[in-house]
């Protein structure tokens, strides 16, 4: 608990009462919420923040955007995967230097660190990025760091140190590839719960990855460093309503000192003159 003058200053800056158990922590519903993240992390008020609303009419076709090489992501025979509830998301940790992504007009090779999910409380919201003002039900982020660095932590404050592949997720047919994750959500009901799961073939989780949007942005959670090359894929992942509901159910299972794990997404940030490009030609009437 903060006391005396420190408490007064904190209230003036954040509008949050000092007795809150979430003081000095960021969150989506408690503590320092997204609109005030800049109080704790000044970078969150930067000019190149993520996510964004991708407006198709403003996207620029770039014929030089290359296809991705994702072949290394199938090397899973002895890769351990840890599924974790970190209090802000469901995260699958996959730290292994052999899991690399090249191509995609990235400035070199990027090593996979983890992937995680953002979702809402209803099907019509949950993704962080939007397309023409529309949310998807969820969004999956594959977080990578340049192979010039040993870790995400080391790379996160360096220009182009990180690259994130973003995938929209909506409701459709049952998706067998997500079974290992869905089945184990019951084992990570509370913050800091984790479980080792069967290693996944990442490319089996992905939709078709030929077409994408590209822009320069930031981490979508504090410290919001503006070091991310963003790729948001055009094609969506589909899971069943039952599978989506298993993520929604995490919002009902928490304990004192943690927030509901639901609606864990940041709203779109201003473009501030940034250009969004794509390798989708016909979609935008380019000749």
Model-identified regions with their sequence ranges:
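Alpha-carbonic anhydrase
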Residues: 2-287
């Amino acid at each position: 608990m903060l006391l005396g003058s420190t408490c007064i200053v904190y209230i003036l800056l954040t509008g949050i009462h000092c007795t809150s158990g979430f003081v000095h922590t960021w969150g989506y519903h408690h503590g320092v919420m997204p609109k005030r993240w800049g109080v704790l992390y000044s970078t969150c008020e930067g000019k190149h923040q993520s996510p964004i609303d991708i407006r198709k009419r403003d996207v620029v076709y770039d014929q030089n955007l290359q296809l991705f090489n994702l072949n290394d992501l199938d090397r899973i025979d002895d890769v351990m995967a840890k599924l974790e509830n970190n209090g802000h998301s469901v995260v699958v940790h996959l730290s292994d230097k052999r899991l690399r992504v090249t191509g995609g007009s990235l400035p070199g090779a990027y090593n996979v660190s983890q992937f995680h999910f953002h979702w809402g409380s209803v099907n019509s919201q949950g993704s962080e990025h939007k397309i023409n003002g529309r949310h998807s039900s969820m969004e999956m982020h594959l977080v990578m760091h340049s192979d010039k660095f040993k870790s995400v932590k080391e790379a996160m404050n360096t220009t182009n140190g990180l690259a994130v592949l973003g995938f929209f997720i909506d409701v459709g047919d049952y998706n067998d590839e997500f079974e290992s994750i869905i089945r184990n959500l019951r084992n990570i009901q509370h913050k800091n719960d984790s479980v080792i799961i069967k290693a996944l073939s990442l490319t089996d989780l992905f939709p078709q990855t030929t077409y994408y949007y590209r822009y320069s942005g930031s981490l979508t959670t504090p410290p919001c460093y503006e070091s991310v090359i963003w790729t948001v894929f055009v094609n969506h992942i589909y899971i069943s309503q039952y599978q989506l509901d298993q993520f929604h159910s995490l919002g009902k299972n928490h304990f004192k000192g943690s927030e509901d794990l639901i609606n864990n997404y940041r709203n779109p940030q201003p473009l501030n003159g940034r250009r969004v490009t794509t390798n989708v030609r016909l979609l935008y009437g380019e000749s």
